[in-house]
Amino acid sequence: SIDIIKWALKTNDPKNWLAEGQLNQIEIDKILITLECDFKKNLDRYKYPNKYDSNNKDFHRDKNLKFLNYLNDLLKKNNALNCPHLSMLDYAILPFIRQFRNVDELWFDALDLIFLKKWLFQFIDSNEFSSIMKKYNLWDPNQTPIYTNFSY
C-alpha cells in the first residue's frame, strides 16, 4: 500500500524518494489514485482478458494511453516523474508500466512515447532492477535456501 510506503520513507528515506519536485502532494496522490483505480483495472483486463470475460482486450489497452501520455509529458522535464532522480512515485508506477509493455512489446515499443520508454528502459537495464528481479530455479523444499541482500 502507498500509505505503508510513505510511512516507511518518513521513517527512513536514504535515497530521498520523498524529494519535492515539479508536483505537489495533491498531484502525486491524484496520479497514484489514477494508477490504482483506472490503470491497473484496465491493465488486468488487457493482460488477462479471459479472466475478466473481456472480448476486447485492445479496448482496455487503449484506455490506458491517456495515462501513458500524461507520464510521457511529465518525463519531458526530468529523467523521472517528479524530480531529477527516481522517487517513490516512479517506483510505484514502473512495475505496472513494465507489465503493460510485456503484454505486447512490439505494439508498446512502436508508440510515440519517447520519454516514457527511455525512463522504463533505463530502469529495466539498471543494476538495481537486475538485482531484485534475478531469476531462480523453482523452489524445492529439499534444496539449500537462497538468501539475498538486494545490493546494487
What is each residue range found by the language model?
Residues 63-67, 71, 96, 119:
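Alpha-helical packing segments of well-folded alpha/beta enzyme cores
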Residues 73-84, 128-133:
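Surface-exposed helix-capping loop/turn segments at secondary-structure junctions
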Residues 54-59, 105-112:
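Acidic, serine/threonine/proline-rich low-complexity intrinsically disordered regions
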Residues 1-66, 76-79:
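GST-like domain detector, emphasizing the conserved glutathione-binding G-site
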Residues 136-152:
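Acidic/histidine-enriched, glycine/proline-rich intrinsically disordered or flexible terminal extensions
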Residues 40, 68-72, 124:
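Structural signal for well-ordered, non-membrane alpha-helices
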Residues 111-138:
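A contiguous, mid-protein "functional segment" used to position or interact
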Residues 81-106, 123:
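GST superfamily/GST-like fold recognition
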